[in-house]
UniProtKB/Swiss-Prot annotation:
It comes from Phyllomedusa sauvagei (Sauvage's leaf frog). InterPro entries: Bombesin (IPR000874). This is [Phe8]-phyllolitorin. Expressed by the skin glands. Belongs to the bombesin/neuromedin-B/ranatensin family. The modification Pyrrolidone carboxylic acid is found at Q49. It is found in: Secreted.
């Protein structure tokens, strides 16, 4: 049997140690990332109140908005010059 030089044993064992260490590090990082995404899905991160966003600014509820009455619609049709038949009470 031939003897393997000590330096070659150190190189091979060093390579294996680095390989083992790198796989351990990547697995722990991967596990941390998946745990973080699971934690985020449990929280309501993207849930916002509509009254504070854009066109809903100042309106706390869309159910309480005032609807236009028939009179308001007739008056707006007069101002727009709409071809709708509008009854005038002179």
């Amino acid at each position: 049997m031939s003897a393997v030089p000590f330096t070659r044993v150190l190189l091979i064992s060093g390579f294996l140690a680095h390989l083992l260490l790198s796989t351990f590090v990547t697995l722990t990082v991967c596990k941390e990332v998946t745990e973080e995404s699971d934690d985020l899905s449990k929280r309501n991160v993207l849930q916002r109140q509509l009254w504070a966003v854009g066109s809903f600014m100042g309106k706390k509820s869309l159910e309480n908005t005032n609807r236009r009455s028939d009179e308001d619609m007739e008056i707006s049709a007069l101002f727009r010059g709409s071809p709708l038949k509008v009854k005038r009470s002179d």
